[in-house]
């Protein structure tokens, strides 16, 4: 059986990327951002095509993402932050609600969002994951921006032409 295949496309040239970074657990979040921005540049995204905004914490990230999505100015968005377990239920609340909010914005506004909000048990775990997670978010945002653009062009794929 023959089938179509869309290969992974990590070409970032010409893409506009919005980044929302939480400031809570700032050293971790800054390391995430540095790795993410470096990878975006490595993959061809121009500095002037990246907009970074910061918010107090992970729970504020979805609203900023929503405002960016509403603008229609971005091909993909990236959420960066760190939620580190403490001694209360707050960890679960922040982790679950920020993740659900990010997913809702993604689906409501039909825009790719790379979720780089780390959820770890310790500071050491968070620091150990910053570099790879930051780079992964850049790659995910670019890949999904290119994929969604390609899929937008598939409106009639697989449908028989009624005029034949």
From Swiss-Prot:
Active site: 90 (proton donor)
GO cellular component: cytosol; riboflavin synthase complex
Pathway, per record: Cofactor biosynthesis; riboflavin biosynthesis; riboflavin from 2-hydroxy-3-oxobutyl phosphate and 5-amino-6-(D-ribitylamino)uracil: step 1/2
EC numbers on record: 2.5.1.78
Membrane-crossing residue ranges in chain numbering: none
CDD domains recorded: Lumazine_synthase-I
UniProt binding sites for 5-amino-6-(D-ribitylamino)uracil: 24, 58-60, 82-84, 115
Classification via Gene3D superfamilies: Lumazine/riboflavin synthase
GO molecular function term, any single one: 6,7-dimethyl-8-ribityllumazine synthase activity
Superkingdom of this protein's organism: Bacteria
GO biological process, one term: riboflavin biosynthetic process
NCBIfam families found in the cross-reference section: lumazine-synth
Sequence similarity: Belongs to the DMRL synthase family.
Name of the protein this chain belongs to: 6,7-dimethyl-8-ribityllumazine synthase
Record organism: Ralstonia nicotianae (strain ATCC BAA-1114 / GMI1000)
Gene name tied to this protein: ribH
């Amino acid at each position: 059986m023959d089938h179509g295949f869309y290969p992974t496309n990590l070409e970032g040239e010409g893409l506009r990327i919005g980044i929302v970074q939480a400031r809570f657990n700032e050293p971790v979040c800054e390391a995430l951002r540095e790795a993410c921005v470096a990878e975006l540049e490595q993959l061809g995204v121009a500095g002037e095509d990246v907009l970074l905004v910061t918010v107090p914490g992970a729970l504020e990230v979805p609203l900023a993402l929503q405002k960016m999505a509403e603008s229609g100015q971005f091909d993909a968005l990236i959420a960066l932050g760190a939620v580190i377990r403490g001694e209360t239920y707050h960890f679960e609340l922040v982790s679950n609600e920020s993740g659900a909010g990010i997913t809702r914005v993604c689906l409501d506004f039909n825009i790719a969002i790379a979720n780089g909000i780390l959820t770890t048990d310790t500071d050491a775990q968070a620091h150990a994951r910053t570099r790879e997670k930051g780079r992964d978010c850049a790659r995910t945002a670019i890949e999904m921006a290119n994929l969604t653009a390609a899929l937008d062009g598939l409106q009639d794929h697989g449908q028989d032409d009624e005029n034949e």
